[in-house]
A protein has these predicted regions:
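Conserved ASCE/P-loop NTPase catalytic core
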Residues: 1-443, 448-470, 474-491, 495-536, ...
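Generic beta-structure capping elements
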Residues: 25, 182, 603-605, 655
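Residue-level recognition of well-ordered beta-strand positions that form the cores
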Residues: 321, 601-603, 653
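Peripheral, non-AAA+ core regions of ATP-driven protein-machinery
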Residues: 359-368, 374-387, 391-393, 409-419, ...
Length: 814
């Protein structure tokens, strides 16, 4: 059952630079297509093509996989062939001021309408000024005013005549109009009144009372006369305004005969101007009519100081919130800060005389408005972090309308009078970007999510490594270098990058499509090329970038290795010991991982077949590690204790472990330590072991095999390579090996060895130097084999247990 050590060419799958037919990446063209994401691209193509309800897309992939750039390029390519969506405008609703109306215009015509309406209002202002200042209008206006004056004059003349007939005259006093007696044209003073008889005074008072009642009738008619005059003045204003602005509006309406919504708006606008022409004329500095007031309206902010436009004219603007005049194809919008208002739009307010006021001109578009008719990209984590944003987006997608809402109004925190803009019809394809765990969490806990986002575009972080993909990868490198304005990469440097890409995914048969990691490596390689004064990135520049990145992150690794070298952490790399073995684990520090050897010990005693995981007992072991330990008991019982009870109690521990332990990659090492303790056969300490094991004794693959091998190699190298040292790995992990060059060179010099094993029996033979032993037909193992010693050791424990149980029972009887 001999196992051959791995050859150097099995430890690292190199990328021969000779396979490339270019000298540097300057000679290569950028990739026309996307690389390594066929599944995600198929999902995107399907999701974009499906126009049914709920076929929005969730792009799931880890950060750095390049999903944003890929999706953006994909969407822009698709959008270029699509129609430009319409412009979106808000205009005043003259019937309900707080409910502005929308106008959906063909692309580029919204701003055109706004400019035409602005010019129209200039013409209206000039026409009104000319009409109201004309001699004819002034004469008619004066005639209306004269009518009121004549009525008042006739009424007072009648009162005057009646007063004279009664020897009285009207006098104006602070208390009102009074009538005083006269003699010979002179008003009688109080002393003269006293000289009159009672009868004469009574007669005068009676006449004065009659006149007072007549005067009261006149005063009661004056407000009615004034109302009649005002109505005539308004009608005069309307007639003059209609005559002045009618032709102006008719000309503009004729341009939009095929757009009923626009002509309807222009008609209501004309009617409002006709009804409020006096207000417009007053705002322009004209002579308004006394007592005339504008129609009811919300308070509006004034920007007269900035634009020269009066507040009264704001109501006739066209607020273009989405202008697609310069858009080519359908829009592709990325919302980086997806708050509720940034998504759905908002109504701004200004402080005006101590109150917050607004109007339809202060409606602002959200990203859903700008992306309407196209595509909206949103980071799902960011939208979940914003209050009300996620619910607002779902509500818009469900209803197919964009309704502008403020967070304060949604929770009734404020009672400020605001607007209720008419909702905008929504036609958009939303692409959420996020990590896979978020996708599955939202899908599990939000029942509406699956109804709205029916398409999942799953982005891979690796792709197959074959000659065609390696050539495509070289073009990818060329494209990134050009985009980032980096030095060209020589073909030897390209080969090195490809090898490092395989190392990044921990698989010699795969390449990383983690675009952020690749781009960072290329940038850093370019930096070292410039530092070295070359004009092309070489292999040594790429290697320097790799080494420098490790050096910046490996302080903790060096500290641990120093503690091992100084015997603060006890790790043996020579000799043999019973029940002790070197296990291997991986420590992750951000994006840097390194291997660390750990001393695992096993101790046995008489018991009831339990294997105690000390890490679990003190709550330092994870569930996967505990599962691996329980598998060991199953293996021991099934293989060695079929004819007698498993009568041992064993304890396993990672010595000098002061943090949590999880994973089952050390379960084979723990089993070897147990077998050594049971058989009392020492294990070589010059070897380290990694690999999980099943109940049948098969060694299973693990992760981080490269880091684990290198971690033990570094310790052995620091103490001096003896040629006896090495690492035992699962045979199925050979395909994942992309070891450092110094490890490969040590193996080539026979200073270090890598042993691939498939079964526990193969591993125990390497560790002890003794044969494992195969059972015969009777189930007996060859003498002096490891399995025979284990079998005998467990049988002896069973006999002791039986003897102990028997003596204990006899003692109790006695």
């Amino acid at each position: 059952m001999a196992v051959n050590t791995l050859k150097p060419d099995q430890l690292r799958v190199c990328c021969p630079a000779e396979q490339f037919d270019f000298d540097s990446t300057d000679e290569l063209e950028d990739l026309d297509d996307f690389i390594g994401q066929p599944r995600a691209l198929a999902a995107l193509d399907f999701g974009i093509g499906m126009r049914g309800d709920g076929y929005h897309i969730f792009a799931l992939g880890e950060n750095g996989t390049g999903k944003y750039s890929l999706i953006r390029r994909f969407l822009e390519k698709q959008a270029a062939a699509e129609e430009v969506p319409p412009d979106i405008c808000y205009v005043n609703n003259f019937d309900e001021q707080h409910k502005p109306r929308i106008l959906v215009m063909e692309a580029g015509t919204g701003k055109e309408l706004a400019d035409r309406v602005k010019n129209l209002m200039e013409d209206v202002r000039n026409a009104l000024r000319a009409a109201f200042e004309s001699e004819d209008f002034q004469a008619r206006r004066q005639s209306v005013q004269q009518e009121l004056q004549e009525k008042q004059q006739k009424a007072f003349e009648k009162l005057q005549q009646m007063s004279q007939e009664r020897d009285l005259t009207p006098l104006r006093t602070p208390a009102g109009l009074v009538f005083a007696p006269v003699r010979d044209g002179e008003v009688l003073d109080p002393s003269e009144l006293e000289k009159l008889s009672e009868e004469e005074r009574g007669e005068l008072e009676k006449k004065a009372e009659e006149l007072q009642q007549e005067a009261q009738k006149v005063f009661q008619k004056i407000p009615q006369w004034q109302r009649e005059i005002r109505e005539k003045q308004k009608e005069l204003n309307r007639e003059a305004t209609q005559y002045a602005v009618g032709p102006v509006f008719e000309e503009l309406r004729s341009r939009y005969e095929d757009k009923p919504a626009v002509t309807e708006y222009l008609e209501s606008m004309e009617k409002d101007i006709v009804d409020n022409a006096h207000v417009l004329f007053q705002s322009e500095g004209g002579q308004g009519q006394a007592g005339e007031q504008p129609s009811p309206n919300l308070p509006v902010p004034s920007d007269q100081g900035q634009t020269g436009e009066s507040p009264a004219l704001r109501r006739y603007r066209v607020n273009v919130i989405v202008d697609n005049s310069k858009t080519r194809g359908s829009p592709v919008v990325h919302e980086d800060n997806p708050t509720l208002q940034n998504l759905l739009g908002r109504v701004e307010h200004l402080a005006h005389m101590g109150a917050l006021v607004t109007d339809f001109n202060m409606i602002r578009a959200g990203s859903l408005h700008r992306a309407n008719g196209g595509y909206l990209m949103v980071d799902v984590l960011k939208i979940l972090q914003q209050p009300f944003a996620w619910e607002g987006l779902k509500r818009a997608l469900r209803s197919g309308r964009i309704t502008i809402e403020s967070p304060g109004q949604m929770v009734s925190l404020i009672s400020t009078v605001s607007l209720e803009p008419e909702p905008v019809p929504l036609n958009v394809k939303v692409i959420l970007l996020g990590a896979p765990r978020l996708y599955y969490l939202i899908r599990q806990y939000d029942p509406e999510f699956g109804e709205l986002f029916k398409v999942g575009a799953d982005f891979a972080h690796r792709m197959d490594r074959d000659p065609d993909n390696q050539k495509a990868y070289s073009r990818l490198i060329a494209g990134v270098a050009r985009k980032e304005k980096l030095y060209p990469f020589g073909r030897d440097a390209v080969a090195k990058v490809i090898e490092q890409s395989a190392r990044m995914v921990g698989d010699s048969r795969k390449l990383s499509v983690h675009m952020q990691g690749l781009t960072d490596l290329l940038r850093e390689s370019d930096y070292w090329a410039r530092q070295n004064g070359t004009e092309r990135v070489r292999t040594e520049d790429v290697q320097k970038a790799i080494d420098a990145r490790i050096f910046r992150s490996d302080r903790l690794r060096e500290m641990m290795q120093e503690q091992i070298r100084r015997d603060v952490i006890l790790i043996d790399t020579e000799g043999s010991k019973v029940g002790q073995i070197n296990g291997l684990s991986v420590i992750m520090l951000g994006d840097f991982a390194f291997g660390r050897p750990s001393r695992i010990t096993a101790r046995i005693r008489l018991g009831k077949g339990d294997v105690v995981d000390i890490e679990r007992e003190v709550a330092m072991g994870g569930p996967i590690h505990s599962k691996g330990v329980l598998i060991l008991a199953g293996y021991l019982g099934a293989r060695y204790a079929m004819h007698h009870p498993l009568s041992l109690s064993a304890s396993l521990v990672f010595e000098q472990s002061y943090s949590g332990v999880d994973g089952d990659s050390a379960s084979s090492a723990e089993l070897y330590a147990l077998l050594s303790a049971i058989a009392e056969v020492p294990i070589k300490q010059s070897l380290a072991v990694t690999g999980s094991v099943d109940q049948l004794g098969r060694v299973q693959p693990i992760g981080g095999v490269n880091e684990k091998i290198e971690g033990f190699f570094d310790i052995c190298k620091s103490r001096g390579l003896s040629g006896e040292q090495g690492v035992m790995i699962p045979a199925s992990n050979i395909q994942h090996l992309m070891l450092r060059n110094d490890v490969v060179e040590a193996v080539e010099d026979n200073a270090f060895s890598i042993y691939p094993v498939e079964t526990v029996d193969q591993g125990i033979e390497i560790l002890t130097g003794l044969p494992a032993g195969e059972p015969d037909d009777a189930g007996r193992y060859p003498a002096d084999s490891i399995n025979a010693r284990v079998f005998e050791g467990l049988a002896e424990l069973a006999r002791r247990r039986k003897a102990f149980s028997g003596s204990g029972t006899q003692a109790m009887k006695e």
